[in-house]
Design a protein with these regions (language model features):
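Catalytic and substrate-binding clefts that recognize carbohydrates or anionic sugar/phosphate headgroups
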Residues: 1-120
Length: 120
C-alpha cells in the first residue's frame, strides 16, 4: 500500500470574523455547510446512512467531488481540487478562534493531479 501525505495550512485571516472554515469535499449529508474538525473519507460507495459528524471512524460518501474551499481574506477564496482515483482521507482542522485552516490528505495511491484556484 502506498500512502501520500499532503498538508496545507492557511495563514490566519486578518479578523476571525471573516473565517468560516473549509467547505466542500464531496457530496455531504451533513446539515452544516462548513466542515467541523475531523476526518472525511472520499471513496464512492452506496451507504445506507451517509450522515457525517467528522468523528472516527469516518463515514464514506455516496458520491465524491474532492474539491474544497476556504476564505483567506475578506473577499478572497482558495479552492483546491484533488483529481485522485484512490481512496482518500482528509483530516480537517478548522481553528475558528485563530482563523487558521489546516487540512491533511492521506491517499492509498500515489498518482493524481492537484489544482489550486485563487480568487482576487
Amino acid at each position: 500500500m502506498n500512502w501520500v501525505n499532503l498538508e496545507a495550512n492557511a495563514q490566519p485571516t486578518k479578523t476571525a470574523e471573516v473565517f468560516k472554515g473549509i467547505m466542500g469535499l464531496g457530496e455531504r449529508a451533513s446539515k452544516e455547510m462548513f466542515l467541523k474538525s475531523g476526518v472525511y473519507p472520499i471513496w464512492n460507495t452506496d451507504v445506507d446512512n451517509p450522515s457525517e459528524d467528522g468523528l472516527l471512524p469516518g463515514k464514506q460518501t455516496y458520491g465524491s467531488h474532492p474539491f474544497y474551499m476556504f476564505k483567506h481574506a475578506k473577499n478572497s477564496w482558495i479552492g483546491v481540487y484533488h483529481n485522485l482515483a484512490q481512496a482518500t482521507d482528509y483530516w480537517v482542522n478548522n481553528d475558528f478562534a485563530s482563523g487558521k485552516v489546516g487540512i491533511q490528505q492521506v491517499a492509498t495511491g500515489g498518482y493524481g493531479d492537484i489544482y489550486v484556484i485563487l480568487s482576487a
